[in-house]
Swiss-Prot record:
A Pfam short name: Pep_deformylase
Species per Swiss-Prot/TrEMBL record: Dehalococcoides mccartyi (strain CBDB1)
UniProt entry keywords in alphabetical sequence: Hydrolase, Iron, Metal-binding, Protein biosynthesis
Reaction(s) this enzyme catalyzes, per UniProt: N-terminal N-formyl-L-methionyl-[peptide] + H2O = N-terminal L-methionyl-[peptide] + formate
GO molecular function, one term: peptide deformylase activity
Active site as annotated: 133
Entry binding sites for Fe cation: 90, 132, 136
High-level lineage: Bacteria, Bacillati, Chloroflexota, Dehalococcoidia, Dehalococcoidales
Annotated cofactor note: Binds 1 Fe(2+) ion.
Protein name: Peptide deformylase
Length: 167
C-alpha cells in the first residue's frame, strides 16, 4: 500500500468524466488499498480515483459510525430523496468549504472490491458522501453547486474542519 498524491484544482483529471473499471484485477485492488490509505492519511471522509490522478469510476469512503471503508466500483446513483443544507469540503480544494444543498437520502449501486453487485442506501452524511464522491467521477465538484461566492468560505489557520465535511 502507498499514500498517493491528492490532485488539486486546476488539475485537468478532476474535470474529466472517468472511465468504467473494465475488470477488477490486482492493479485495481492495489489502487483501492492505496486510496483507502491515502484517505485515512489525509483524514478525509471519502476519495474518488480521479483525486489520485486515476480517471476510473471508483470511490472509497468511511462509514462515520464504524470508520470502516466502503468501496464502490462503477457506482451509479439510482435514487435521491429529500433535501438538506450541508457544509462540505474537498481534499482537492484545500483550505475552503462551502454551503450547499444535498439529498437527504441517496441510493447507489455498483460493485464491491470483489466484483459483487451491491446497493447502498445512505442518509445524512452517507448520502452526502455518495453524492460528493460519485460526482467526482463526472468531473463535478461541490463548488459547482454553489449559488454565490458568499457560500464559499476560506478556512482560517485556527479553524478545524469538521470530520464529516473533509471529503
Amino acid at each position: 500500500m502507498a499514500i498517493r498524491r491528492i490532485c488539486e484544482l486546476p488539475e485537468p483529471v478532476l474535470r474529466k468524466k472517468a472511465k468504467k473499471v473494465p475488470s477488477i484485477d490486482g492493479s485495481i485492488q492495489t489502487l483501492i488499498d492505496d486510496m483507502i490509505e491515502t484517505m485515512n492519511s489525509a483524514d478525509g471522509a471519502g476519495l474518488a480515483a480521479p483525486q489520485v490522478g486515476v480517471s476510473l469510476r471508483l470511490v472509497v469512503f468511511r462509514e462515520p459510525d464504524t470508520k470502516e471503508a466502503t468501496v464502490l466500483i462503477n457506482p451509479e446513483i439510482v435514487k435521491k430523496e429529500g433535501q438538506r443544507q450541508v457544509t462540505e469540503g474537498c481534499l482537492s480544494i484545500p483550505g475552503y468549504f462551502g454551503e450547499l444543498t444535498r439529498a437527504e437520502t441517496v441510493t447507489a449501486k455498483g460493485l464491491d472490491r470483489h466484483g459483487k453487485a451491491c446497493r447502498i442506501k445512505g442518509t445524512g452524511i452517507v448520502a452526502q458522501l455518495l453524492e460528493h464522491e460519485t460526482e467526482h467521477l463526472d468531473g463535478i465538484l461541490y463548488i459547482d453547486h454553489l449559488e454565490s461566492e458568499d457560500q464559499l468560505h476560506e478556512i482560517g489557520p485556527d479553524d478545524e474542519m469538521p470530520e464529516e465535511i473533509r471529503e
